[in-house]
Amino acid sequence: MTNIRKTHPLLKIINSSFVDLPAPSSLSSWWNFGSLLGVCLGVQILTGLFLAMHYTSDTATAFNSVTHICRDVNYGWLLRYLHANGASMFFICLYLHVGRGLYYGSYTYSETWNVGILLLFAVMATAFMGYVLPWGQMSFWGATVITNLLSAIPYIGTELVQWIWGGFSVDKATLTRFFAFHFLLPFIVAALVMVHLLFLHETGSNNPTGIPSDPDMIPFHPYYTIKDILGFLIMLTALSTLVLFSPDLLGDPDNYIPANPLNTPPHIKPEWYFLFAYAILRSIPNKLGGVLALVMSILILAIVPILHMSKQRSMMFRPLSQCLFWLLVAILFTLTWIGGQPVEHPYIIIGQTASVLYFLIILIFMPATSLMENYLLKW
């Protein structure tokens, strides 16, 4: 008799995705981050749901409702910090996942890659709107500064910003709609994840060598389910340690001050996971130019498949490209550091240099190095 998991209409979908899925035998721990992101999304939706039961999206009570959650709700402090630090863990896994894709050439699966870029934008939008909800100083001023960037769009900019605000400044209408979208977007993200997996399972997974692995496949369960569970345990241990020992490590102290439109914080900055893009934005003196650079810093991922010039897919056997890749990682760390610094010498010039190098490496140096490596292969 055939196993029910192979015949039942619902179970056979799960079976073909997580049990009998043929997977390359050589997948390293860098392939764990997809499942870790799934766990992060689950944790965020669950903690967010319980937080939404106690949160009020009104400018008069939002800040106090968050205080009430932390002080009066049973384990409310745990929910709040799991949600806030869960977002940080989400982005750590996201950036490592994208980095893995760049290093091992996974971007050649263009449909999966493009849906992944959409997912990245959706998660960034969700995180930005979530940061506004506690209605602290950095929430308010971060929302004001970032939404104001849209006013750089020619002709319709000002009207667009006022339409998003629901008035002439960030106020009650803005907070209410941001809460509505912050609640809705994770479910759209979950739907996009399904599409992401659908496209991935059409082609099968890439592997560290970048060589087709059709002759050497193993079932996903038990090999990679066990490996993923180990990943879950490590990540949840790290998250628990962060939440229980230093929950405010990655937050901004200014957000413990209630939002005040009459008092601007000395340094307005977003959460740490947006600092690299914020540094690129600040590096360009022109407003519209800065906004374009900000969008392009993420959107540039969409043209990476077109810029792939190498005869080899993965960087595993391409030492010159590896050097450039790690230089790019160092530049992203530099940009993240610069984004958190005040706009003064020498930070301005460091930020501008790092921003130019970021785009140069992706657009020119990497394709040129790939062509050079192709030439060296003939020797």
Curated annotation (Swiss-Prot):
<dbReference type="GO" id="GO:0006122">
    <property type="term" value="P:mitochondrial electron transport, ubiquinol to cytochrome c"/>
</dbReference>
<feature type="binding site" description="axial binding residue">
    <location>
        <position position="196"/>
    </location>
    <ligand>
        <name>heme b b566</name>
    </ligand>
</feature>
<dbReference type="InterPro" id="IPR016174">
    <property type="entry name" value="Di-haem_cyt_TM"/>
</dbReference>
<feature type="transmembrane region" description="Helical">
    <location>
        <begin position="288"/>
        <end position="308"/>
    </location>
</feature>
<keyword id="KW-0812">Transmembrane</keyword>
<dbReference type="InterPro" id="IPR030689">
    <property type="entry name" value="Cytochrome_b"/>
</dbReference>
<keyword id="KW-0830">Ubiquinone</keyword>
<dbReference type="GO" id="GO:0008121">
    <property type="term" value="F:ubiquinol-cytochrome-c reductase activity"/>
</dbReference>
<dbReference type="Pfam" id="PF00033">
    <property type="entry name" value="Cytochrome_B"/>
</dbReference>
<dbReference type="InterPro" id="IPR005797">
    <property type="entry name" value="Cyt_b/b6_N"/>
</dbReference>
<feature type="transmembrane region" description="Helical">
    <location>
        <begin position="33"/>
        <end position="53"/>
    </location>
</feature>
<keyword id="KW-0472">Membrane</keyword>
<dbReference type="GO" id="GO:0045275">
    <property type="term" value="C:respiratory chain complex III"/>
</dbReference>
<protein>
    <recommendedName>
        <fullName>Cytochrome b</fullName>
    </recommendedName>
</protein>
<feature type="binding site">
    <location>
        <position position="201"/>
    </location>
    <ligand>
        <name>a ubiquinone</name>
    </ligand>
</feature>
<feature type="transmembrane region" description="Helical">
    <location>
        <begin position="347"/>
        <end position="367"/>
    </location>
</feature>
<keyword id="KW-1133">Transmembrane helix</keyword>
<comment type="similarity">
    <text>Belongs to the cytochrome b family.</text>
</comment>
<feature type="transmembrane region" description="Helical">
    <location>
        <begin position="77"/>
        <end position="98"/>
    </location>
</feature>
<dbReference type="GO" id="GO:0005743">
    <property type="term" value="C:mitochondrial inner membrane"/>
</dbReference>
<feature type="transmembrane region" description="Helical">
    <location>
        <begin position="320"/>
        <end position="340"/>
    </location>
</feature>
<keyword id="KW-0408">Iron</keyword>
<keyword id="KW-0813">Transport</keyword>
<comment type="function">
    <text>Component of the ubiquinol-cytochrome c reductase complex (complex III or cytochrome b-c1 complex) that is part of the mitochondrial respiratory chain. The b-c1 complex mediates electron transfer from ubiquinol to cytochrome c. Contributes to the generation of a proton gradient across the mitochondrial membrane that is then used for ATP synthesis.</text>
</comment>
<dbReference type="GO" id="GO:0046872">
    <property type="term" value="F:metal ion binding"/>
</dbReference>
<feature type="binding site" description="axial binding residue">
    <location>
        <position position="182"/>
    </location>
    <ligand>
        <name>heme b b562</name>
    </ligand>
</feature>
<keyword id="KW-0999">Mitochondrion inner membrane</keyword>
<feature type="binding site" description="axial binding residue">
    <location>
        <position position="83"/>
    </location>
    <ligand>
        <name>heme b b562</name>
    </ligand>
</feature>
<comment type="subunit">
    <text>The cytochrome bc1 complex contains 11 subunits: 3 respiratory subunits (MT-CYB, CYC1 and UQCRFS1), 2 core proteins (UQCRC1 and UQCRC2) and 6 low-molecular weight proteins (UQCRH/QCR6, UQCRB/QCR7, UQCRQ/QCR8, UQCR10/QCR9, UQCR11/QCR10 and a cleavage product of UQCRFS1). This cytochrome bc1 complex then forms a dimer.</text>
</comment>
<keyword id="KW-0249">Electron transport</keyword>
<feature type="transmembrane region" description="Helical">
    <location>
        <begin position="226"/>
        <end position="246"/>
    </location>
</feature>
<feature type="transmembrane region" description="Helical">
    <location>
        <begin position="178"/>
        <end position="198"/>
    </location>
</feature>
<dbReference type="InterPro" id="IPR048260">
    <property type="entry name" value="Cytochrome_b_C_euk/bac"/>
</dbReference>
<dbReference type="InterPro" id="IPR027387">
    <property type="entry name" value="Cytb/b6-like_sf"/>
</dbReference>
<keyword id="KW-0349">Heme</keyword>
<feature type="transmembrane region" description="Helical">
    <location>
        <begin position="113"/>
        <end position="133"/>
    </location>
</feature>
<dbReference type="InterPro" id="IPR048259">
    <property type="entry name" value="Cytochrome_b_N_euk/bac"/>
</dbReference>
<feature type="binding site" description="axial binding residue">
    <location>
        <position position="97"/>
    </location>
    <ligand>
        <name>heme b b566</name>
    </ligand>
</feature>
<keyword id="KW-0479">Metal-binding</keyword>
<keyword id="KW-0496">Mitochondrion</keyword>
<dbReference type="Pfam" id="PF00032">
    <property type="entry name" value="Cytochrom_B_C"/>
</dbReference>
<dbReference type="InterPro" id="IPR036150">
    <property type="entry name" value="Cyt_b/b6_C_sf"/>
</dbReference>
